[in-house]
């Protein structure tokens, strides 16, 4: 049922070292403020911190009370205050207000600000403007890599997507380059590097500069990971906009997985309490179904329940000695498995109820039609109906964006009509959101006569005119075009299937979207790995508007073992989805690779839309 790893699959590196490093550094920073202290933690850092150092560890290092950073006066009576925050202007103003309030009251305390993952000059400037810079000591907690699972690392920076891909803010690129530098220091150099996208290229170049500055740290080291692939989220928006149908993706879409764990409510736990559950490879039930298409999951869980019952029933014919062994060795494991099984059955039932209510089948049918380019008028009507019924502002936006990207922009009549209906249905406050979506290239309007061929000719003009200095005009008129249909054809993203697609025994990565579509990001990775570079993919790169932004760097490394050359680190800049993770795990099983994922944050279609929205839920 689950994807068993091939017997010859390479072993994954041990990423628990990253947790230990982060914990030790935090303890060191806390001990620089000797004695009892109160710790103020920003909400966004609470879940990551919990995975690294729990409350008892903090208490061992003289943290007395914990507070959440929120916009209200602090009630702390401690003589020492420590703030663990993201480098944000609003946090600086909050800290400054506390320090200034103490000054007004004639109270003297010690203040320490720990920025994670790094401090920015702008933050120090705000503290200076507020007149408190001399009263606080500032430090950095370079915690930028959180292992969520044996093969998944997250920077837990969901704001990376909006900051870079909408605002053009490059501040997190240094954080990413530092994270890659740390990985190459701990796990040896990466002999083969590939990448595509403007952000990927900038991050790669900065990372290489860091490597050169500290030359010698990785020299002579045996590489543990043979390949690294950096990919910008805007290279493939389509995959992130599609509804997920693998189990882990559906759990994320339905319940929101946060920092590797999920809150299951009473409808799942069959009690009056919610339960926080860690979802990773240690959960044996979850690990067997996480990458499966949802249609297979119920059958598997039913079979698992029967097997479990059979194991319980074995005890009936046991003598006292056998019963003693059963209780001491097996019973605890069976009870744990039973608890997890009940939870996942409850989660499946809850997902089924919600999806039946939403008419999920009709939604998936519309998405598939958009991906294939059929019945576009019918799909547009479906979206209009969705808006008129006020189903969900986020869902309606998502479908409009999917229509726009797959059709290379909406024809002006449809763009104006859908936008007007949306604003009338959900409110004029969403107007700025449309501006953001347009700016990011997610929801655009075709210029008159902007057919696919016209767009393609502009792209080729962009490539040929760059020497003549005309690149800026060509790029600005074109940067946000998607060319999805042409790319889909070139890379065979829509499989042609005779008869039914077998979701029980899938033959390709398309199973993560019910056999209708191979994720573009995953297909690019597959093709580049096969070719050991971008040779033969020039046309695809051109259609992706990345002619200057696809790179390969291969160094001959005799120390690289055949095992390390089958380990591939994929870095998603701007977030990746659980569907992409499942698809690449499948590819790894088929080809004998093991993929490791590093993402700025795990994302899905709703998070993508929320990042662009100016209306906060």
Curated annotation (Swiss-Prot):
Q: How is it modified after translation?
A: Phosphorylated on tyrosine residues.
- One GO CC term, this protein: cytoplasm
GO terms (BP aspect): intracellular protein transport; lysosome localization; melanosome localization; membrane fusion; platelet alpha granule organization; protein transport; vesicle-mediated transport
- Where in the sequence is N-acetylalanine found? 2
What topology in the membrane does the UniProt record assign?
Peripheral membrane protein
Location comes to: Late endosome membrane; Lysosome membrane; Early endosome; Cytoplasmic vesicle, Clathrin-coated vesicle
Keyword Disulfide bond (UniProt): no
Which keywords accompany this UniProt record? Acetylation, Cytoplasmic vesicle, Endosome, Lysosome, Membrane, Phosphoprotein, Protein transport, Transport
The record's annotation in PANTHER family points to: VESICLE PROTEIN SORTING-ASSOCIATED
What does the UniProt function comment say about this protein?
Answer: May play a role in vesicle-mediated protein trafficking to lysosomal compartments and in membrane docking/fusion reactions of late endosomes/lysosomes. Mediates phagolysosomal fusion in macrophages. Proposed to be involved in endosomal maturation implicating VIPAS39. In epithelial cells, the VPS33B:VIPAS39 complex may play a role in the apical recycling pathway and in the maintenance of the apical-basolateral polarity.
Q: Which family does it belong to?
A: Belongs to the STXBP/unc-18/SEC1 family.
Subunit architecture: Interacts with RAB11A and VIPAS39. Associates with adaptor protein complex 3 (AP-3), clathrin:AP-3 and clathrin:HGS complexes.
Q: What is this protein called?
A: Vacuolar protein sorting-associated protein 33B
Taxonomic path: Eukaryota, Metazoa, Chordata, Craniata, Vertebrata
């Amino acid at each position: 049922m689950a994807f068993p790893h091939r017997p010859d699959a390479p072993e994954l590196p041990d990423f628990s070292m990253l947790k230990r490093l982060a914990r030790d550094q935090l303890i060191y920073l806390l001990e620089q403020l000797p004695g009892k202290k109160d710790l103020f933690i920003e909400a966004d850092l609470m879940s990551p911190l919990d995975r690294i150092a729990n409350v008892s560890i903090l208490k061992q290092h003289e943290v007395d009370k914990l507070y959440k950073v929120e916009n209200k006066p602090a009630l702390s009576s401690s003589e020492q205050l420590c703030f663990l925050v993201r480098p944000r202007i609003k946090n600086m103003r909050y800290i400054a207000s506390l320090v200034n309030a103490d000054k007004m009251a004639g109270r003297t305390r010690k203040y320490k600000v720990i920025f994670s993952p790094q401090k920015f000059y702008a933050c120090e400037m705000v503290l200076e403007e507020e007149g408190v810079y001399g009263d606080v000591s500032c430090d950095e907690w370079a915690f930028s890599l959180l292992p969520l699972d044996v093969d998944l690392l997250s920077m837990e920076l969901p704001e990376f997507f909006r900051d870079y891909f909408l605002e053009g803010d490059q501040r997190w690129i240094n954080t990413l380059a530092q994270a890659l530098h740390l990985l190459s220091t701990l796990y040896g150099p990466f002999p083969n590097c590939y990448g595509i996208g403007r952000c990927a290229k900038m991050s790669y170049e900065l990372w290489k500069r860091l490597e050169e500055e500290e030359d010698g740290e990785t020299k002579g080291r045996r590489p543990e990971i043979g390949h690294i692939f950096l990919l910008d989220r805007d290279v493939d928006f389509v995959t992130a906009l599609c509804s997920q149908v693998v189990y882990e993706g559906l759990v994320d879409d339905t319940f929101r997985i946060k920092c590797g764990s999920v809150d299951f409510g009473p409808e799942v736990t069959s009690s009056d309490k919610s339960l926080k559950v860690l979802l990773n490879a240690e959960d044996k039930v979850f690990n067997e179904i996480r990458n499966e298409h949802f249609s297979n999951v119920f059958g598997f869980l039913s079979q698992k329940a029967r097997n479990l019952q059979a194991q319980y029933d074995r005890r009936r014919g046991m003598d006292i000695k056998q019963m003693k062994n059963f209780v001491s060795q097996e019973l605890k494991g069976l009870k744990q498995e039973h608890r997890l099984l009940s939870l996942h059955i409850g989660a499946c039932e809850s997902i089924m109820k919600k999806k039946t209510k939403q008419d999920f089948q009709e939604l998936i049918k519309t998405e598939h039609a958009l991906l294939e380019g059929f019945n576009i008028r019918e799909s547009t009507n479906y979206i209009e109906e969705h808006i008129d019924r006020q189903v969900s502002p986020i869902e309606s936006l998502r479908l409009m964006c999917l229509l726009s990207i797959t059709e290379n922009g909406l024809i002006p009549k449809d763009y104006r009509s859908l936008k007007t209906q949306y604003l009338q249905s959900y409110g004029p406050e969403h107007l700025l959101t449309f501006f953001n979506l347009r700016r990011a290239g997610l929801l655009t309007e075709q210029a008159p006569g902007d057919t696919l061929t016209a767009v393609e000719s502009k792209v080729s003009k962009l490539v040929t005119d760059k020497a003549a200095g005309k690149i800026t005009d060509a790029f600005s008129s074109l940067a946000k075009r998607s060319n999805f249909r042409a790319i889909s054809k070139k890379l065979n993203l829509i499989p042609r299937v005779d008869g039914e697609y077998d979701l029980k025994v899938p033959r390709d990565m398309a199973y993560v979207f019910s056999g209708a579509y191979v994720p573009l990001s995953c297909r690019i990775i597959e093709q580049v790995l096969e070719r050991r570079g971008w040779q033969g993919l020039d046309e695809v790169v051109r259609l992706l508007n990345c002619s200057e932004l696809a790179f390969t760097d291969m160094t001959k490394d005799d120390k690289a073992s055949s095992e390390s050359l089958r380990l591939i680190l994929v870095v998603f800049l701007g977030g990746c989805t659980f569907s992409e993770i499942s698809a690449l795990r499948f590819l790894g099983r088929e080809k004998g690779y093991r993929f490791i994922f590093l993402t700025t944050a795990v994302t899905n279609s709703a998070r993508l839309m929320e990042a662009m929205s100016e209306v906060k839920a």
